[in-house]
């Protein structure tokens, strides 16, 4: 979890390959209306996000027997609660990726994505840092972060 540009997808793909667990890109589950809204530089509301979070929650349920890695902003505690669906056999293991805002800006400028740089501030303002998560500064290498996650999962 983390704001746009924090490296969720990059880490998630690499971690999925390392652990032989499927990876899901949360952005792929946004309704077209949400994507259009973000492209028009309008921040999403809680109401906009709810159908997206419900869809992601259903995906987590589908994959619970073998596990899945999901890249999702999950900016607020209430979003994480919705994703920690009471129907799940196990609670999600949260990894919070963070980095300084200048690095985030550089990353967002250099990529093709429907989430424009203009909306980064709205995500940072909305972000409620998780109390129960493995916090990783993504200035580390992907391999270092994967090793930290593996150690945490084995404890």
Regions found by a protein language model. Give the residues of each.
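Conserved lysine of the Walker
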Residues: 8
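P-loop (Walker A) phosphate-binding loop of NTP-binding proteins
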Residues: 3
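Conserved phosphate-donor/acceptor-positioning beta-strand/loop module used by diverse small-molecule
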Residues: 88-107
């Amino acid at each position: 979890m983390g704001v746009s540009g924090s490296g969720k997808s990059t880490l998630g793909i690499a971690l999925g390959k390392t652990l032989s667990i499927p990876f899901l890109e949360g952005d792929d589950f946004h309704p077209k209306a949400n994507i259009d809204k973000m492209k028009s530089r309008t921040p999403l509301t809680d109401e906009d996000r709810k159908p997206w979070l419900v869809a992601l929650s259903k995906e987590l349920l589908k994959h619970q027997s073998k596990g899945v890695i999901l890249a999702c902003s999950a900016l607020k505690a209430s979003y994480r609660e919705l994703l920690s669906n009471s129907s799940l056999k196990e609670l999600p293991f949260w990894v919070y990726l963070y980095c300084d805002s200048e690095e985030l800006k550089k990353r967002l400028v250099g990529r093709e994505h429907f989430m424009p740089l203009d909306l980064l501030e709205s995500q940072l303002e909305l972000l409620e840092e998780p109390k129960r998560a493995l916090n990783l500064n993504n200035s580390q290498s992907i391999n270092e972060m994967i090793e930290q996650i593996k150690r945490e999962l084995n404890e």
